[in-house]
Amino acid sequence: MAKAIFGEDFSGTLVRDRYAAYNHIGAHWQACLAHIITTLKGIQREHALLPEPEKDNHVDSFTCRLKDLCSRACDIGQKLKSSEISQKSATRMERHFLKHLNNSCKQPLRFKPAETLRRYLIGPDQKNLFTFLRIPGVPPTNNYGEQSPERVNKNETLFVRN
């Protein structure tokens, strides 16, 4: 479906979540950092419901550090958009973000949802987490797309049905 919309020769940069329909569209893409933050919040809520003996002591610090990292990256995206920082400065920041990300993801986690996210963040798609720092005009989230009239209508319809 996505290829039918974007075409076989799409050469732009998609800002997307991990929805499989977007795989193999375009050479570059930006992972939506807002979706990652939402996933981290969900992991925190779910983990908090576990009985104390089943909790992984590292999950809370993992989720807090990564929420902070993603929020700071989004702030940099805003500063890029408003020209408060240059693209050249932003490009240099990617190493800093990756270093902090990799340090935060060193410890394997027992809580499966957190471990699944940790593996994703250190896996081959890691290069797509901070694409916005390398490619001018690419935002760190797809929040704009989430607020399009079609998406708002779909969200309202789903909300009414529940």
Predicted regions and their residues:
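Catalytic center-proximal scaffold of phosphoryl-transfer enzymes
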Residues: M1-N162
